[in-house]
Structures are given as C-alpha cells and as structure tokens.
C-alpha cells in the first residue's frame, strides 16, 4: 500500500507535464516543509480540476493575496502513485480549498485501501493553478479544425476528409 499525504499549508501546488506533445505525462505536485509529493495524473484530470477550481473561485471573494509565480515542477519528478479520482471542497472557516486525490489501485494489489493526498490551498494558489493548467493545455498538440482531434507532430489524416487530406 502506498503512503497517504496531508498538507495543511503547502508552499507549492502545481500541475506539470514531462515529454513532447502527444506523449506528455501529467503530474500534480505539492510541497510543504521540505516534503515534496508528485502524483501521476491524466491530462483530463488536470483540465477538470482547473475548470472546477475556476468555477469555485468565481463564487468566492476575489483573490487579494499575491499569486505564486513559479509553478514549474520541482525536480526530481518521482511519482508516489497514480491518481484515480480527485475531489474538491471549501473550508469556509479556514478560507482554504481542499483538494483530495485518491490512488488508483492495480488489481493485483489486492484489498488494501487506496492512499490519498489531502491538500489545503489558498484561493491565490488555486487561481495560479488554473492559469498553469490552462498554459499546459495550450502547450499540447494542435487541434484539427475539421474533426477536433489532436494532430500528431508528423501530420494528421483527418477522418472528416475520409483519410484523403493529410495536413
């Protein structure tokens, strides 16, 4: 069974990707008091988390504090485990957003409980995460205007053109 983590005042919370477009591996990363945790995630999990946080921030008071600037992944990028699901909540008393990531268990791992990572972030950290995630999504593969599928670096055989147009 993998380790669980709880960060109540992280100084770093971000998403990042390693590898060329089309082959990138996505990560969520948090650090508190020298403890760095990196979790492997899916691109769509990062996108969904950013969209949800963006919507949540619209319902909360404006971010008054300074947003973190450097949201790069911190080396070494060693994944603790793979994310299966992400949940988000708001702790009104502490004015913190709770992000909970749950571990994906492999079938052969048996009946143990999945690990979790609980991270309490500020509204400024959430706003910075949203901007970082948006930049990550834009840095991916170009989208075909006809079929809305990502284009590979070597070109794209568009199904809407019945495979006849390679662009």
What are these regions (language model features)?
Residues 1-20, 26, 64-120:
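Intrinsic, low-complexity N-terminal interaction/targeting segments
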Residues 11, 20-27, 37-38, 58, ...:
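Surface-exposed, interaction-prone regions used to assemble/regulate multi-protein complexes
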Residues 19-52:
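N-terminal interaction modules that seed assembly of large macromolecular complexes
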Residues 24-29, 49, 53, 97-99, ...:
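Short, structured motif recognition centered on aromatic/hydrophobic residues
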Residues 33-35, 44-46, 55-56, 104-107, ...:
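Short, surface-exposed beta-strand-loop junctions and turns on beta-sheet-rich folds
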Residues 39, 103-157:
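Mixed-charge, glycine-accented linear interaction segment located at domain edges/termini
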Residues 51, 55-62:
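Short helix-loop boundary/capping segments at the starts of domains
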Residues 158-167:
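Short cysteine/histidine-rich metal-coordination sites, predominantly Zn2+-binding motifs
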């Amino acid at each position: 069974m993998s380790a669980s983590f709880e960060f109540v005042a992280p100084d770093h919370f971000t998403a990042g990707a390693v590898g060329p477009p089309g082959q990138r591996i996505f990560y969520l990363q948090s650090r508190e008091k020298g403890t760095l945790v990196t979790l492997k995630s899916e691109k769509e999990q990062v996108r969904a988390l950013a969209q949800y946080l963006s919507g949540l921030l619209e319902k909360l008071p404006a971010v008054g504090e300074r947003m973190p600037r450097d949201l790069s992944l911190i080396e070494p990028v060693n994944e603790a485990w793979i994310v299966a699901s992400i949940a988000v909540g708001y702790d009104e008393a502490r004015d913190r957003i709770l992000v909970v990531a749950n571990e994906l268990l492999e079938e052969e791992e048996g009946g143990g409980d999945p690990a979790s990572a609980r991270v309490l972030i500020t509204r400024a950290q959430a706003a910075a995460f949203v901007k970082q995630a948006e930049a990550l999504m834009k840095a991916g593969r170009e989208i075909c205007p006809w079929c809305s599928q990502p284009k590979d670096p070597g070109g794209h055989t568009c199904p809407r053109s019945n495979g006849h147009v390679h662009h």
